[in-house]
Amino acid sequence: MSSPLHYVLDGIHCEPHFFTVPLDHQQPDDEETITLFGRTLCRKDRLDDELPWLLYLQGGPGFGAPRPSANGGWIKRALQEFRVLLLDQRGTGHSTPIHAELLAHLNPRQQADYLSHFRADSIVRDAELIREQLSPDHPWSLLGQSFGGFCSLTYLSLFPDSLHEVYLTGGVAPIGRSADEVYRATYQRVADKNRAFFARFPHAQAIANRLATHLQRHDVRLPNGQRLTVEQLQQQGLDLGASGAFEELYYLLEDAFIGEKLNPAFLYQVQAMQPFNTNPVFAILHELIYCEGAASHWAAERVRGEFPALAWAQGKDFAFTGEMIFPWMFEQFRELIPLKEAAHLLAEKADWGPLYDPVQLARNKVPVACAVYAEDMYVEFDYSRETLKGLSNSRAWITNEYEHNGLRVDGEQILDRLIRLNRDC
């Protein structure tokens, strides 16, 4: 661990750190390592206090930890009693980030083998090595948002004695459910969001239909040179499960045309809203977070056939898709094209190890408090409740007050409520 120069932000002492960990934790003596990045936060007036640690695990997979710009939200509440570690999970942010150029020297099989080491089990083993450096004599606590909550359940399965408290927000994993089952449930949620969106903004349907027809008939290029297709337009529904997303999407559509031509500003906005070129791990590993001893076989693509309303054709009303990954993306997105063969190999890989230990979770003694969002588009509510039935010492706050991004919207209040829930106060 190195300790570069710290800085102070809004009364917070911030210090970046780098950690070296094995690429493959099953082969720790292998010489191949990766570098992880984390940022520790502590209130400046409490630097000399003996504070417990809280590790924040970001959602995704494929996104780095937040870059704080103020003492607010959940960070403000956490810093009242914790030192916080914002960890860029392996392959994201500043932690040996995955991109096509990094893997260009490898053949597709080698690329797939390399990428297979970036799931939750490896992320958790990274975190445990870091805990042994930062808090060797004491367990630490976790705050897991979305996929970060999935990682937290993996942590509870592998290293329960290393944890003091766990807080999950929109992140109770569908343990025991296949990728097919997950997408079957989330497609229904996406269909519900489509109905709600077009009911709220009826005029948007005609604009979306016109856009789809225009993209089908014309070779439209984004500012980066990538062709914009109907399928990519459908993916603008990725954020429909977040508060404020309906308005953002409507305003995007509203400004799409200038007369008969597309507005250049619209094209820049669409490009900025696509995370797959900047965060390729999101596309490569998304289905694999649901795989234990089975291949995904492009589950979202196969299950989509059960929802014909989501398959656009001329003369049909347009509908958006959600958080689904499709094989065609590796033929259209510029940063995914070089990883196409590796992605197909990973989709056919069946010998994935376990991510969770249901027996250990059933006898769990670590207090776990969960915010479960009843209308979550990304993490199926019914499957979360199933998992909670098998997770001892857990308490759930079930609410429809927030969407999946509740922690970002009202993090101070949500974390405070979960802390009180865990401690019976």
Swiss-Prot record:
This protein's GO CC annotations:
cytoplasm
Q: Name one Pfam family in it.
A: Abhydrolase_1
Q: What is its EC number?
A: 3.4.11.5
Instruction: Name the Gene Ontology molecular function terms of this record.
Output: aminopeptidase activity
Main site of residence? cytoplasm
Q: Which UniProt keywords apply?
A: Aminopeptidase, Cytoplasm, Hydrolase, Protease
Question: Where does the protein end up?
Answer: Cytoplasm
Question: Which InterPro entries did the record assign?
Answer: AB_hydrolase_1 (IPR000073), AB_hydrolase_fold (IPR029058), Peptidase_S33 (IPR002410), Serine_prot/Carboxylest_S33 (IPR051601)
A Gene Ontology biological process in which this protein takes part is:
proteolysis
- Is Magnesium among this UniProt entry's keywords? no
Coiled-coil residue windows: none
Q: Where is the AB hydrolase-1 domain?
A: 52-315
**Which reactions fall under this protein's catalytic activity?**
Release of N-terminal proline from a peptide
> Looking at its record, which EC class is this enzyme?
hydrolase
The role this protein plays is: Higher activity toward long peptides. Acts on hydroxyproline beta-naphthylamide with almost as high an activity as on proline beta-naphthylamide.
Its family remark reads: Belongs to the peptidase S33 family.
Subunit comment for this entry? Homotetramer.
Spell out the protein name for this chain. Answer: Proline iminopeptidase
Q: Which gene encodes it?
A: pip
